[in-house]
């Protein structure tokens, strides 16, 4: 018996003991300390558009983008640009524009001809950037015919002529674009054609020559969605997402990228990259959760400008999973110096169309390094990019992708959300708190929720982010329009006004501003004020919980008395309010005090208890299974040792006893096909009046052709043909119990025992005794021919063709079957006395040596009588009829004896036939290929 069950509990115990040391790599979503909405907010906090604008009343504002200049908030929308004085808004006048410009499309008719809807044929202001300190550049879609204008920042009056907006502004308002002025030139990234098939990074409107990216080259840009552009050092950086080229085998997988170009790039030579960028490089932004299997947030949604983080300039970005993946969002920060260092990495290439992208070895990279700015660093010897060698220009055109990806700060996301709506926008205040050293993130989602998050290592110094507040900022009554509910609730813009202590939230149909904190809700309860952990709130001894703005809150306490926070109800000397529904701290989530926490069961102890209980149960289960298996094994051994029939007499064995029989009946005269007897039958007695079915010509080992075997030897004994290896090992003292016949095999049929048969029968225990009885002397019957002489019966006939490798008989070629039947009615004749059975029951070697296992659950065979199939039953009470009982030895108890009425055959025995010229022989060991 295998002893595996004894080791299973030990293995399970070791596995369970290792579980407490395993930690989940994926961070959990933080729970909000406070959930609020905008109920009770003043209507002046909302802006939907001009009151006399019928289109705005129907469609809403159709917000496009924010721009803050000198305490002035500019809002680009459909057909308008609104200007809000933040100083006046701070004084409480509400969100009312002090001036605005109107710029309507003059090409509505052509837009309709192009197959566009009326709602799309407006002028959506997609570009709004400062040209200089006095001038503003604005570009609109102009009914799918983009144009640009310049306006005065203070007056919002047009200055100069209109300019073409192609490659500066998209044709469709749903297409992405970014733009920025750097050293007097406009750097823009958008789609340059009506079908949005030509994505371009373009420079224009400056003293330097216009340049663009390679056209229709997927290695440079492949269906990009531009998010942000900024100037840093000698380069201009573009942040976008695009369909990956290095993982194209995975399908349309989007990756987040950052690309850069040199501000002093003058283009290539006439031989390579003429009027194209010679410094365009890009690499991947890696925002992922580390682990054995890295989980990526690949889709860049929004990005901030440079923010101070730990004394270094960093960019905060919102990333999401793929559109067909599990919804999830993450916030990752990247240091600008790490991004610059990433552009010094190795180049990547694809050797073959189906091959993987691999780094290029350094010995294949030309000098100076491709992508370097001419006149700086390694390319300082070249005054202009037009003077660069051709091999450098050719290399940079074919290898714009770099490796590896830029890692995030702390090499993991600052925040992950998997059970909430997807994040869409981000705004960061890196100078929060009384000492301007706390970083607070404001995140917008696609369900209209604003999340206020304290970054890890903030005020509490913990490693996990703290979700301070969750605000539902959407109002269907003020922001709904013809847009769908999902599109209308999506936050598409966030603008932070730290001086005014406000956050502007933009939806498609409206904009609203929120205060950065609402400390007054905590009232005079010190515990509630400090438990909120809001860096914009602090406890003042005389004024209670107040707002902290900049460095003016140095006299405000944000730590408080820890003892007063841990014990007792929320009481204050000024109000005397207590904890409860009326307390301002009621509903604020906070940590349990240590006294309550100590009453809980430690997690290691709980896990150890569970592991011990499971191990004990596994041990008991293994012991029970082992005992059951041993008991079953002993019972099986007893069954094998029980004396009795080695196996019951099968149909094949009985058929082999009667090799001869009458000829098959002639075909019917009416031409009908002879019915094929059933191949399978049952041992159950048939109902009354129903003729017994016939069995098909059962295949026998003699009728199965035997494959030729190497190293054949002649059979030494003609009786060895049908004996197996077991018969050969028992020596000559064993009697042959099998009979090989070259003729067709008989068919047998089982019938129920006849009623009224007397007890005159011969009990047969083994097939050897049955053959001994059949071959013994038999009284002659009336009218029967005398038996053939013994000498004629003992001589072996000529070898049958079937035994010498000839074709096996088919079912329709079989001889007429002999049926073992019972006498239908009448009285049974007297049978001679049963011969004494003194020898032990030998094993039966019938059927080519194949032994069937004896089963104690097998039903006993029915009474069998041998009757010709073609004529009436031979059963009668006259002489020559004998009853045979297939009995069991004395050691096999508990079952009734079985009777078989068998008529002794009048045919001669057919011993195995082996021709002298036959090339077939029994293989070594007496095995047969049946």
Curated annotation (Swiss-Prot):
Keywords: Cell membrane, Developmental protein, Differentiation, Disulfide bond, Glycoprotein, Membrane, Neurogenesis, Signal, Transmembrane, Transmembrane helix
Keyword Lyase: no
Low complexity bias locations: 829-844
Cytoplasmic compartment segments: 626-930
MF terms in GO: chemorepellent activity; semaphorin receptor binding
Disulfide bonds: 111-121, 139-148, 262-373, 287-332, 479-510, 519-537, 525-570, 529-545
Residue positions with a glycan: 70, 286, 437
Membrane spanning residue stretches: 605-625
Ranges of residues in domain Sema: 30-516
InterPro entries on file: Semap_dom (IPR001627), Semap_dom_sf (IPR036352), Semaphorin (IPR027231), WD40/YVTN_repeat-like_dom_sf (IPR015943)
Expression sites by tissue: In adult tissues, expressed only in skeletal muscle.
GO cellular component, one term: plasma membrane
GO biological process, one term: positive regulation of cell migration
Membrane topology listed for this record: Single-pass type I membrane protein
Entry annotated with the keyword Lipid biosynthesis: no
Primary localisation category: membrane
Known role: Shows growth cone collapsing activity on dorsal root ganglion (DRG) neurons in vitro. May be a stop signal for the DRG neurons in their target areas, and possibly also for other neurons. May also be involved in the maintenance and remodeling of neuronal connections.
Family of the protein in this entry: Belongs to the semaphorin family.
This protein's name: Semaphorin-6C
Organism expressing this protein natively: Homo sapiens (Human)
Gene (UniProt): SEMA6C
